[in-house]
Amino acid sequence: MHTVEDMLVEKNYSKCPLKKRPVNYQFEAPQNHSNTPNEPQDLCVKKMEILEENPSEELINVSDCCEDEGVDVDHTDDEHIEEEDEDVDVDVDSDPNQTQAAALAAAAAVAAAAAASVVVPTPTYPKYPWNNFHMSPYTAEFYRTINQQGHQILPLRGDLIAPSSPSDSLGSLSPPPHHYLHGRASSVSPPMRSEIIHRPIGVRQHRFLPYPQMPGYPSLGGYTHTHHHHAPISPAYSENSYYSMRSMTPESSCSSSLPEDLSLKHKNLNLNLNTSQPGEQAAAKTGDMSPETMPNASAKKDKNQPPRYQCPDCQKSYSTFSGLTKHQQFHCPAAEGNQVKKSFSCKDCDKTYVSLGALKMHIRTHTLPCKCNLCGKAFSRPWLLQGHIRTHTGEKPFSCQHCHRAFADRSNLRAHLQTHSDIKKYSCTSCSKTFSRMSLLTKHSEGGCPGGSAGSSSSSELNYAGYAEP
């Protein structure tokens, strides 16, 4: 039976590129040092660092804190550790027989050397007693910087406001927790500032103001201002990052906490009130400034508005010249051209109309364009012809809700409804009788009324009953 090696030897790879030629590897079974034999095999070839965890202490990089305080730190051990790290790197290609146990032993040696070089530093800031908590934790260099001319910078609100944790409210002097990893290099982040101390909640009303107090204002003790709670400052905070952050923020954010300087406005208001009349002073105090008490209001209003075009005949003004021209041409009654109004007269009769549309509607009464195909009767309106056709077909779509009578035209139904009402539309002037239709009133006045005549009767409404044209 041929093995894999025999098969590879038989094939000729002289003309095959090197990167495509098969490589023959020989692996040895690693020894299992774990207590549990059922765990999967760890095939990781990278360097593994096993760090001994100590739950009671946190390891902090000494170089991060000491460099900030001006303490010289010897970095020779760091170079030695880096050389050891380079020696411990496992080269799988050069020595394939090296086992995993040797790699773990080398990693443990590196971890022990790193743990020996790390020392937990003691805090360098003083312990303030309870009665001195109003003192500011900033250094003298910080005050010299902010007191320079043209650099009135307000400290961060996060430094002057108490933290939200309950431990700080009890007056704890421990520095904020640092989450540095074991053996972390100093080049990863800027050094931690040891003078940043969170203040307890009970000292919120004591705050330092680096800007001078302006004259003419009451003491800032009674001045209340809502503080904006900022996010807690990270351990990577430094003085350079503080000034870079303050320079990036606009000046309005810094000046928003200061009250507006209204001294000039108050002085001008007092001068105006003293020179004005007593009635104007009372109106200004109450806030009701009427147009009568402000003589200059109308003048300012006229200056701001564009000029208006006034009609010389009726004194009306318009914002545009086209509006004034249209007013003079059509609407102005005092204009010379509008004194004699246009009139449209009918050629067949003596009637006159103001508009041309009304004259055209009147001409239809003479021409009668709507004619019935059954009887040849003509009408001036199409709806009158439609009501006439219903008399031929017998259709009566309009019915009375009281007596169930039906009518072909709506006007006939409207006249019929008057018979059911107590008050009729048409009344006789002689006997005060009322009728639902004009024809009934005429019949009554001509033959039935004792003291009436044909000319004495009058009506208050038009007749809706007939279809015939006048």
Curated annotation (Swiss-Prot):
Protein species of origin: Drosophila melanogaster (Fruit fly)
Keywords: Activator, Developmental protein, Differentiation, DNA-binding, Metal-binding, Neurogenesis, Nucleus, Repeat, Repressor, Transcription, Transcription regulation, Zinc, Zinc-finger
Lineage of source species: Eukaryota, Metazoa, Ecdysozoa, Arthropoda, Hexapoda
Stretches annotated zinc finger (C2H2-type): 309-331, 344-366, 370-392, 398-420, 426-449
Principal location listed in the UniProt entry: nucleus
Gene: esg
Effect of G387E: In esg[VS8]; 50-fold reduction of affinity for DNA binding
Tissue specificity statement from the Swiss-Prot or TrEMBL entry: Expression is complex and dynamic. In early embryogenesis, expression begins on the dorsal side of the embryo. Expressed in a pattern of longitudinal stripes early in germband elongation. Later in embryogenesis, expression is in cells that correspond to the wing, haltere, leg and genital imaginal disks and the abdominal histoblasts. In the embryonic leg disk, expression is restricted to imaginal cells. Also expressed in the central nervous system (CNS), tracheae and head of stage 14 embryos.
Region Disordered, residue ranges: 271-309, 448-470
Alphabetical GO biological process terms: asymmetric neuroblast division; branch fusion, open tracheal system; cell fate determination; cell fate specification; central nervous system development; epithelial cell migration, open tracheal system; epithelial to mesenchymal transition; genital disc development
Cellular component aspect of the GO annotation: nucleus
Localization terms from the record: Nucleus
Family: Belongs to the snail C2H2-type zinc-finger protein family.
GO MF annotations in UniProt: DNA binding; DNA-binding transcription factor activity, RNA polymerase II-specific; DNA-binding transcription repressor activity, RNA polymerase II-specific; RNA polymerase II cis-regulatory region sequence-specific DNA binding; RNA polymerase II transcription regulatory region sequence-specific DNA binding; zinc ion binding
The protein's name in its UniProt record: Protein escargot
Role this protein plays: Transcription factor that can both stimulate and repress transcription. Binds to the consensus DNA sequence 5'-A/GCAGGTG-3'. Regulates cell motility and adhesion during tracheal morphogenesis by stimulating transcription of the DE-cadherin gene shg at branch tips, thereby promoting tracheal tube fusion. Maintains diploidy in imaginal cells by inhibiting the transcription of genes required for endoreplication. Required for development of the genital disk and acts as an intrinsic determinant of wing cell fate. The somatic protein is required for maintenance of male germ cells.
